[in-house]
Amino acid sequence: MSKNLLIELGLEELPAYVVTPSEKQLGERLATFLTENRLSFEDIQTFSTPRRLAVRVSGLAAQQTDLTEDFKGPAKKIALDADGNFSKAAQGFVRGKGLTTDAIEFREVKGEEYVYVTKHEAGKPAKEVLLGVTEVLSAMTFPVSMHWANNSFEYIRPVHTLTVLLDDEALDLDFLDIHSGRVSRGHRFLGKETTITSADSYEDDLRSQFVIADAKERQEMIVEQIKTLEVEQGVQVDIDEDLLNEVLNLVEFPTAFMGSFEAKYLDVPEEVLVTSMKNHQRYFVVRDQEGRLMPNFVSVRNGNDQAIENVIKGNEKVLVARLEDGEFFWREDQKLQIADLVAKLTNVTFHEKIGSLAEHMDRTRVIAASLAKEANLSAEEEAAVDRAAQIYKFDLLTGMVGEFDELQGIMGEKYALLSGEDAAVATAIREHYLPDAAGGALPETKVGAVLALADKLDTLLSFFSVGLIPSGSNDPYALRRATQGIVRILDHFGWRIPMDKLVDSLYDLSFDSLTYTNKADVMNFIRARVDKMMGKAAPKDIREAILASSTFVVPEMLAVAEALVKASHTENYKPAVESLSRAFNLAEKADASVHVDPSLFENEQENTLFAAIQGLTLAGSAAQQLEQVFVLSPVINDFFDNTMVMAEDQALKNNRLAILSDLVSKAKTIAAFNQLNTK
């Protein structure tokens, strides 16, 4: 008869960002433990609050399944001595399995007999197996851990309670310095210690003590309460998903409420107000039906609605202090001069091994000028890029960004406009940070995109030049994100700038502040980011073929990846790739100094293939270029069927290899076709 298992770990307050991943990890680790220990189950449900992680297993088998295993031993000729008795080898084998020689039988395998024994192991009761679940808790990993009291061990937070119930029976376990029981803790202020009656009563037992153990239920409660406030107040609330996920892991019993602040603060830029509310106070932003910001906010209390008026006043008071800061900085920053702030950047360190922020900007300005020409920007756009590159970090020294660093670039744009800078310059100051996250928004203007590229390129080259290169998952300076941004921007704007030539040109630049080094590492790093971009849809062989091509133009490479993936599902893909691969492999034997001499042609097939190669222009989209190469497959095959490429006559051989080399030279601008898998 199956049973239900409950495990709850009661902890000191967990960081909100740790709660959900830890809940998931606990469920996955327990499922693995049960499977490995041959305890079948029907379902696993996980729970979490800021002060507990829990899991309930439904339909858990009462005991392990029996285990029957066959073990192969030595050959019969080794297992028996001259008198037909079991040798020491046979005796040692069965002894190692916990059996006797009575269990031996001989089975024929590929014409020879071997010793076999079958071991039967009866399943243990679930209760006995579950004594090992503390291994699951010990194996949990966290981004941060701590010691407490005089204990030698460490964990995410101090452990206060451990509840392990099999139906209504409490199992006797020890974890760290805690002995298991059936006592759990209710809400820190509204509840008290409570007894968990059984695995099935878990949620109800905690609910009576003002704890909603199911995170999904808490989330639904928060959303429903906010929706009710929207209807009652005739407003719209920005239910930001990330904020919602954070808030639900800050409360055990949620109660949403609406507060307000003076309308005068609406004169401060919206981004400042939103940052103050959302990022610093964990409040939801309120708007009117037209989407305009209102002097209100929605927060979620960890508790019921008792004395909610006092809670609202307290939250309003805390927010007003933030808004006062924002209003003050907004007013005072406008008294500053951009030129003065830029001059002070010489005293701001970009990185101690690299130099000042001003030096970083100087290098970025040079790179941006080069990129502007490569991207065919207009003279007006080039001028905007140059001006933006001279000042684009000035807002880092404003009071507002010093207090709210999330607003860097955003405030730079606003202050630049107030100072009379051109709109394109101001926008570029904001956009140079983009994308600021994986999959984040990209610059919308060419000026902003060029500045973003230049800033990211100097950042990448500078850190690599001083040996600060990401390794494994360690990337403290977000260089992977910066490089991914470079790739995405180039693709988004369709700028066909050869990446290898661009990097070569950057390494030819001379700066007093820094000398770029480690070029090979930089190129490999960029290739890895392009590979990651292609990896979303393209299999490994296609990615490798494109990365081995003779061109490194990001938009073209990504387009070829898409075209090859589509082509790989067509019937002519395999024969075309195979004929091209044969040409690629033979062309590796060609003498680069030899050029095709048509006077040495001995058959029509040589002439036909050479003419086809001469006429191969590779124009149009990636798919069209691919088709232009693929249609040569019959011509290539006809050439191979009628021509001995590796002829004994050295001149003929070199000439025929030169034909193939010409073909490969053009085809390789698309991909190294011999890297593709047709099996």
From Swiss-Prot:
- Cross-referenced InterPro entries, in alphabetical order? Gly-tRNA-synth_bsu, Gly-tRNA-synth_heterodimer
GO MF entries: ATP binding; glycine-tRNA ligase activity
Q: GO CC terms for this protein? A: cytosol
| Signal sequence segment | none
Claim: Magnesium is one of the keywords in the record:
no
Q: Which reaction does it catalyse?
A: tRNA(Gly) + glycine + ATP = glycyl-tRNA(Gly) + AMP + diphosphate
**What EC designation does it have?**
6.1.1.14
SUPFAM superfamilies associated with the record: HD-domain/PDEase-like (SSF109604)
Sorted alphabetically, the keyword list is:
Aminoacyl-tRNA synthetase, ATP-binding, Cytoplasm, Ligase, Nucleotide-binding, Protein biosynthesis
Pfam families for the chain: tRNA_synt_2f
Chief place where the protein resides: cytoplasm
| Biological process terms in GO annotation | glycyl-tRNA aminoacylation
| Binding partners and assembly | Tetramer of two alpha and two beta subunits.
Matches recorded under NCBIfam families? glyS
Q: Which family does it belong to?
A: Belongs to the class-II aminoacyl-tRNA synthetase family.
Protein name in the entry: Glycine--tRNA ligase beta subunit
The species is: Streptococcus pyogenes serotype M5 (strain Manfredo)
Tell me what gene encodes this: glyS
